[in-house]
Curated annotation (Swiss-Prot):
Binding locations of GTP: 35-42, 62-66, 80-83, 147-150, 179-181
Gene: engB
Protein name (Swiss-Prot/TrEMBL): Probable GTP-binding protein EngB
SUPFAM superfamilies: P-loop containing nucleoside triphosphate hydrolases
Segments forming domain EngB-type G: 27-198
Amino acid sequence: MAEEFLNTHNASILLSAANKSHYPQDDLPEVALAGRSNVGKSSFINTLLGRKNLARTSSKPGKTQLLNFYNIDDKLRFVDVPGYGYAKVSKTERAKWGKMIEEYLVTRDNLRVVVSLVDFRHDPSADDIQIYEFLKYYEIPVIIVATKADKIPRGKWNKHESSIKKKLNFDKKDHFIVFSSVDRTGLDESWDTILSEL
């Protein structure tokens, strides 16, 4: 349980950054959270930290346009990466986000693992596959978290998991976690897996 190692409720947003000159300058380990717009990233953060509105959930996808750094008990940081795959964002804007995300993922020494969130209800998008391949190429540790599990009958979970893994060309050495912010499925497993990567 995470509570043995850190007070997960002692969390706050630290800063938002557009480039590396704005990143926190210390050696705290960081966990990046990446995923499509409206995949449930904010809900995932809020559920893990036992807070309702620390990470703002948005009905307007693509609202997170900066890297948002969250301080957790002065021992760990979550880094909320801008949601990708939002159609109404211009190509220029998407390219800018892509460059910002890439710079962080490839150059940040503090980064320990990326939690890549996918929607459990659907096959991974081209963007989901691309970011997974990117992380594998650069040998960045990755945890796949399949969100919104409460929307699928438990009897169909294996089928959905197999389909997602096949489309991603999933590496068996990586972790795959089924998660729901509604009934907290996967909460302890998420924390245990994240902490094992630090």
